[in-house]
Amino acid sequence: MLTLHHLETSRSQRILWLLEELKVPYELKIYQRDAKTRLAPPELKAIHPLGKSPVITDGEITVAESGAILEYLVETYGHLGKKELANLTPAAGTEAHRQCRFWMHYAEGSLMNWMVMKLVFMTIPTQPMPFFVKPIARIICQQVQNKLVDPN
């Protein structure tokens, strides 16, 4: 039986979505973040050395990282879901397949870092802080976005 090790507020939500769309039977094991540190609990290290989520176990196979999990699920269970999901990826060896892989990994690797930075620098000025610091924080965050994040 496939098990999804789901950590609250993690990227495993998209794995849940795909499992449902593919109609794959699965068990859901839910983990809570530490209330103080917001880190994953140590129990996840017993599943995978990274100690993070999402992670799936499928029999003897353990797969970590959401992009790798999505690829594994499509390759292994893609035929089980809705008819229109049967061909989620183009045929292996084709240019379309290479492009699909590129965009999947670009989204997970290169793009995600910039998206997280943008989110952080957009959020900082909205957080509680002394009134005299707020304009400085806003200017610094805007400059970081303009000169570093947005050009990339």
What is each model feature region?
Residues A137-N152:
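Amphipathic alpha-helical packing segments from all-alpha helical-bundle domains
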Residues M1-P135:
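GST-like domain detector, emphasizing the conserved glutathione-binding G-site
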